Amino acid sequence: MMRVFFICAMLCGILMGCSQSVSKDSLLEDYDYFFSQLEQIHPDPYSAFGGEENFKKEVRQLRNELAGTDSLTLDEMQSKVTKLLSALHDGHTYMGYDNSPKKVEDRWIPLKFKVIPDGIIVNGFSPELKFLKGAMLCEVEGESLESVLDRLDKIVISENRYGLMGKACTSIGNTNVLRQLFPSFDKERVSMKFRMVNGRDTLVRLPFHPNGPFWKSIVWSSADERFPKNNFEYRFVDDDKQTMVMCINSIASADVPDIEEYGIKTDVIVADVFAKMLREMKVSNSSRLIIDLRGNGGGWTMIMYAALYELYGKRFMETDLGMHFSTKISEAWLKKNNTTLELLSQSRGKSLKLGDFMEEPSVISSFDWFMCADKSILEEQHGEPIYTPKEIFVVTDVQTFSAAFHTAYMLWKMGAKVVGVPSGQAPNTFMEITPFKLPNTGLECSASNSLQSCFHKDHPMAKTLTPDIQLSYDDYRKTDFSNDAELIFLIQF
């Protein structure tokens, strides 16, 4: 099936020297290179713009606009390109941002936000704003949140409404973003209306603070120490050993060849850790497994096949997952996978050329598709599951993305219940990053190389995988808006 690279490792651009000192001509050369690569790599860069002609027209118009500026900076170019790319609603395609220090002029309101099924709530605050804990955001500068989100959708990249709300959480309190949302905004405070825990609306005028030591004073909603927090850490959370919780905050393990090259240090082998956990559950005849995928930005989908095989045995390999995946062949994709057209054609048993699409199977029928460092663990099962608990829950939030979304989706197709907040990843979307570097700035960028379809295009979940169980605002309130509200809810479920 698909190979989804660890997205967090790719999101940070690496610049040689000072990006802001690059000449306008050099930046425009990078602009041209970016869009030439996008057209070669991306499976469909045109449809969102109304066709190839309109796409090229918009790219040309933006280039002319950038060329007409007196002094063009990389930040300005990236911001404009991101606005244009927002039409794709593709979280794997981006012109990356550089790794220079945060600008002093960046200022933020002293609040942090979180997405719940009903909207956006406050889950971090400076001490004097404690009264806003758990308050629901309703308006910004006199405009409804829905209206503000519609504006934000035109300047950031997101795949569905929940992903857009996730972007709002990290950007809506920033002065530079507010100026883009409200062109005439030039104030020392921003007005926001909140619905308080008691149901009353409160208008608050919030000041801005620059990057610096102030942010150490932010108070966050609490986490519950009963639950594991490290990657692939697991533990029973009840005295009777009936409920096991595993935390997976990155789909990355030692199963990935040369994992250290991605800046990741781990000795976890998925087949090994899942086998140990399931055997512990089997000894105690445990009835419930909770897999926590919140905050998981992705990684390598194929390392999780071993976990599903250990949970479900040969039934996993006989199940049509309904995930249709089509990959476009490009020079950059071949380079990423360290192969050639000749070798690829041989492995596929047919002649392939650049621009062709390869269809991947929706049934994982062979261990050949597994990325597993120790398949002997799986072979010893002889098709039988190690242990299948009566109830399996997988917990998601807006940050459950890419390979983490795939994991949640596959578990759901196998019968697990999805719990929490919908993923910001659309089921029907573009997928997989193919990285490339801009020649002058050295900036790391990416274009999707595949089309993914989990549902018919008119299916109500084509853009948003709706969880089977979603908490109400009152459910969150009952946990004092704990960061682990979904897990607390489940162990009481």
Model-predicted regions and their roles:
Residues 20-290, 295-325, 329-342, 391-393, ...:
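Flexible, low-complexity junctional segments that flank or bridge functional domains
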Residues 294-296, 388-405, 427:
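Active-site neighborhood of thiol-dependent amide/isopeptide-bond enzymes
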